Amino acid sequence: MEESSSVAMLVPDIGEQEAILTAESIISPSLEIDEQRKTKPDPLIHVIQKLSKIVENEKSQKCLLIGKKRPRSSAATHSLETQELCEIPAKVIQSPAADTRRAEMSQTNFTPDTLAQNEGKAMSYQCSLCKFLSSSFSVLKDHIKQHGQQNEVILMCSECHITSRSQEELEAHVVNDHDNDANIHTQSKAQQCVSPSSSLCRKTTERNETIPDIPVSVDNLQTHTVQTASVAEMGRRKWYAYEQYGMYRCLFCSYTCGQQRMLKTHAWKHAGEVDCSYPIFENENEPLGLLDSSAAAAPGGVDAVVIAIGESELSIHNGPSVQVQICSSEQLSSSSPLEQSAERGVHLSQSVTLDPNEEEMLEVISDAEENLIPDSLLTSAQKIISSSPNKKGHVNVIVERLPSAEETLSQKRFLMNTEMEEGKDLSLTEAQIGREGMDDVYRADKCTVDIGGLIIGWSSSEKKDELMNKGLATDENAPPGRRRTNSESLRLHSLAAEALVTMPIRAAELTRANLGHYGDINLLDPDTSQRQVDSTLAAYSKMMSPLKNSSDGLTSLNQSNSTLVALPEGRQELSDGQVKTGISMSLLTVIEKLRERTDQNASDDDILKELQDNAQCQPNSDTSLSGNNVVEYIPNAERPYRCRLCHYTSGNKGYIKQHLRVHRQRQPYQCPICEHIADNSKDLESHMIHHCKTRIYQCKQCEESFHYKSQLRNHEREQHSLPDTLSIATSNEPRISSDTADGKCVQEGNKSSVQKQYRCDVCDYTSTTYVGVRNHRRIHNSDKPYRCSLCGYVCSHPPSLKSHMWKHASDQNYNYEQVNKAINDAISQSGRVLGKSPGKTQLKSSEESADPVTGSSENAVSSSELMSQTPSEVLGTNENEKLSPTSNTSYSLEKISSLAPPSMEYCVLLFCCCICGFESTSKENLLDHMKEHEGEIVNIILNKDHNTALNTN
């Protein structure tokens, strides 16, 4: 006959002694349990004893005892209906004996007559520090004295947290108030405190109102001790608290700070204390400041106690683990627990797996991640194919999380399946369906189109409206629990780049095959990373550069009125929907904010000056947007300017105006760089060559050639002793270009799209932006500038270039490791290159630390014109000639190195294949190389469809 009893646990708090009563299934008589627990060592005891020694100078003498009654078990196995997470109230009571050791608590069983009075229902007391159990309150007091405690014990009910100093009063309360309630509980709720005289109990109730419930399934009696230790492990891992006013507080001492990196640094002081290792916030999926268990006030003690309520018996299973679902009863009204558990990083939702045999009890494991464990180098492509669209119609790029990467709490939710999207209420019993049910949660949404290997997901307008009406939309600008640092954003975007790098080849092939059939307008928006060009691959690849328009929207797509490419049958609604490819809009917002923080070159005056000049040339450029109230002004906000189209926010009016270029509708065949409008695709191609071509200035006195006029002048002055005036006069002609017409300024183009040009006062370099010319001007002022080959940024300090590369982190082909290696090599060898001749300038295939062709000043017209391709050798070409796919790489590495001036160093981005590691400085070479992996990409897609079908079955 199974005998049931209740257990009281004493839990220490900062400067206090407290106790909590929890219910526990006891299979043997109480006295036998007493002897077993006295002799059986508990691993939690050693941890708590170490804690007691650490905080012996910070404790008080007040003990708090929380009691609860539980009926006798009537069956061996029952389904688990509900359990409640109970926590200790936070209070600090000064005591004259505050220098004694921390209170350690005892367990006590009531006398047999208590069982008879309560109809076979027993109440027992348990010490949370040493697990001592007894049925006599006097034995409990004697046990507390053994811990050096002489002060009185306060009793507290574990269900409603009523406190009392009288044992009889609390016993009567448990029998009268909770006898009937224990039989009808189906869902745990925080109980309102009813004791008006105890501020301690009131504070407990206020805190428990924000604590989510934890349904737990316990294997057997032997695993209960391990289960308690696992919950305590959860508390020990929560070694810090996040206050509501935005400060982090160390629970081992009184240290407070405003940033997690400062908290991490501080944690070294507590290394080795109570299993406190160096903190990694990777596993922190709970909302900061909301799940504030008893460890929020008790340093390293038993901070969470699982309580079984009423007739809910502890189920006995043979499974290897205990599934724990943490959810909020308030959240159930808008979304189901399954949906919450699948949404990592969303407030008040968490899915964890507790293994009684493990020390690490709170490792987050999701089925989606388990199914995507990398076994090969094709993980990135699998991540992209497995991604599902979010509710705003953007593609969420799933990236692989690094061990030290940190997640933001403002991450957008994934769309669940149709049943989960309805947001209907599910009881906690229904929520615990196991991993079989969880598989359906992570299934990708059906609205995913495979466009020749380029995976584009979207949400229909009806689905978006439904989600909006259901209130499932999350505010993208809601302040997260912690801001992602620049380095974390860089790592995140680099991982996204690896996932995206396998896709461009299939999209490029289809576009080359299909776009030729479309001669109408609005085929592809000029702001996108893909542009409609009915000509050769070289010019097309130039326009495929994903970061060509960083200020014009990075990689976002605007609405298109015609079909992007031929869609599978039954999926033609893509032509009318808002299509987004590349990275999601949430990542776009992060990147734009990142660019603001890292753009150390452009001040507010520069941006406003540029925008003012552009407005004078195009007075109607932003009036349509502003007239439609696209920009929302929120007074008294940190970022008052907000874009209504994508929720991008900024604290600078110039930045928000610059951001509006993302949504600007362009004319067909309009140049995305200088607003020039061509008549047809051929004219646009010829015009684009003007922006991309390499200018070579050749000395008339010898056969030397240079990429900059300043280098030519220095050469003529030093080698041929020519004055500067003669050098300037003779350097007007040596430019070798595809044709003379392409050398004209843009003002001579379409008069309706005339935009002011900024010209360098030293050479004839021109740019549509003031910042671009200013950056270019530094080339003439520095002996050894370091140049970014993507946007033309130059600096004399290599670490500055390393920091600058953050703004390019969203490039599809951005290889973070290789770029870092190249820059580091440039730093380490910056002192040696001076002694080398131009022909011996270092140029390694894996480092690419010197590439003047890619890094020429004319290769990037401004900071927003990101041309990463190696320019072609255009000597002697005419206007009607078209570039071949290999013409952009006509320069051999040896010839490039021979053209490198001795005083210049360049850091070149590599285009990397994430499948086999192939690297090239030319995007065309990478696209050609990716054809070899076409079969592998198709296999990935087929395997994904096969796995999805298996999961569905």
Swiss-Prot record:
One of its GO terms (cellular component) is nucleus. Keywords: DNA-binding, Metal-binding, Nucleus, Phosphoprotein, Repeat, Transcription, Transcription regulation, Zinc, Zinc-finger. The modification Phosphoserine is found at S95, S427. This is Zinc finger protein 507. A zinc finger (C2H2-type) spans 125-147, 155-185, 248-270, 641-663, 669-691, 697-720, 758-780, 786-808, 911-933. GO terms for biological process: positive regulation of transcription by RNA polymerase II. Residues 854-888 have a biased composition (Polar residues). It holds the Pfam family zf-C2H2. It is found in: Nucleus. It comes from the Eukaryota. Residues 470-489, 831-888 are annotated as: Disordered. It comes from Homo sapiens. May be involved in transcriptional regulation. Gene3D superfamilies: Classic Zinc Finger. The gene is ZNF507. SUPFAM superfamilies: beta-beta-alpha zinc fingers. GO terms for molecular function: DNA binding; zinc ion binding. Belongs to the krueppel C2H2-type zinc-finger protein family.
